[in-house]
Regions:
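Long, low-complexity, compositionally biased intrinsically disordered regions
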Residues: 1-150
């Protein structure tokens, strides 16, 4: 994933700050009501489709991508056409974040199972090797050790 990947800058808090409370809440409602019909991600962009509330209208097509100055988007709804960040774009972004959270949880569960087959010595050697180059990991390991000593 490069520096221009949507995943590097797309977070719930950032999105809420960009769009404002009202639009963010309306996007959450759009997602929770099952109107997001699909979301796909590629490096640097998200694409999705949202069912409109009004019967007979065509689904809204949403695209979110990264520019040098932040997130950019397109939506075929009237609000999106006026270049405002709409609830449909928020719903697509939130659907992506939800999907990513589930994916990571599954990966971590599988990793936990795999780690049970690794010797304690190999795990310790690997952790120490990574802690030598990752200050955050080093501090996390120190915290774990300090708690265990109590």
């Amino acid at each position: 994933m490069g520096g221009n990947d949507v995943a590097n800058i797309l977070h719930r808090e950032t999105l809420a700050m960009i769009v404002g409370t009202r639009t963010f809440e309306r996007g959450e409602q759009c997602l929770s009501s099952g109107r997001v019909l699909g979301v796909e991600s590629a490096i640097g962009e998200l694409c999705g489709v949202v069912r409109p509330m009004e019967a007979g209208r065509r689904p809204y097509e949403v695209r979110i991508w990264v520019r040098e100055d932040g997130l950019a988007y397109q939506c075929t709804c009237p609000v999106g056409a006026s270049r405002q960040f709409c609830k449909h774009a928020v719903a697509i972004a939130l659907a992506h974040l939800q999907k990513e959270t589930v994916r990571v949880e599954h990966e971590l569960a599988a990793l936990r199972v795999d780690l049970m087959h690794v010797s304690m010595a190999a795990l310790l050697d690997g952790l120490v090797a990574h802690a030598q180059v990752d200050r955050g990991l080093l501090e996390a390991l120190r915290t774990i050790c300090n708690k265990a000593k109590r």
